[in-house]
């Protein structure tokens, strides 16, 4: 995924009302931009940090600029735009970056499935193999006090994420292939674990899903102001 023109940078003043953030340029100009992330954004929205934003050419948008990246005091870059996770996953699958997901003929997105009225992020199909259901999650929470490079998901209690695990478990039990794909959108994260200390129920459901045959994949993104792409697998640690 390339950014043309390249992302512009400014300093974060504050994030508020979930969808908005105020930024300041070197010349003192203050601007309100859109924040495409309704989550906790733990460690991703510290006032004073550098941020990068894109600009839409849609004249109807009230806030044409969208917050894309943050940079921490340690120099780590984080993609905070949650929409990018699915886009990067689709791009990586189509370019055969994710070796575990090669060999399928058809890729569909947002397909209805399951008993809890869900939509799967990505559905892969081929005539010679079971359907492959892929739920994509972005990982941006770095543990800055414990093991070096340890990332966690989720960063807050997620009943929606719990539902997705139940749906994936059902798919695996019914003979389909079921994948939980963590897209790691924080340059400082080198391994991922379930955040039992944040959402114990999610952690338990994930273990049950794995026992039922759900596969867990983690792929890390390379992040810059001109391009984002998934580049390599990293470990998931139970």
From Swiss-Prot:
Disulfide bonds: none annotated. It comes from the Bacteria. InterPro entries: SfsA, SfsA_C, SfsA_N. One of its GO terms (molecular function) is DNA binding. Pfam families: SfsA, SfsA_N. Belongs to the SfsA family. PANTHER family: SUGAR FERMENTATION STIMULATION PROTEIN A. HAMAP family: SfsA. This is Sugar fermentation stimulation protein homolog. It comes from Vibrio parahaemolyticus serotype O3:K6 (strain RIMD 2210633).
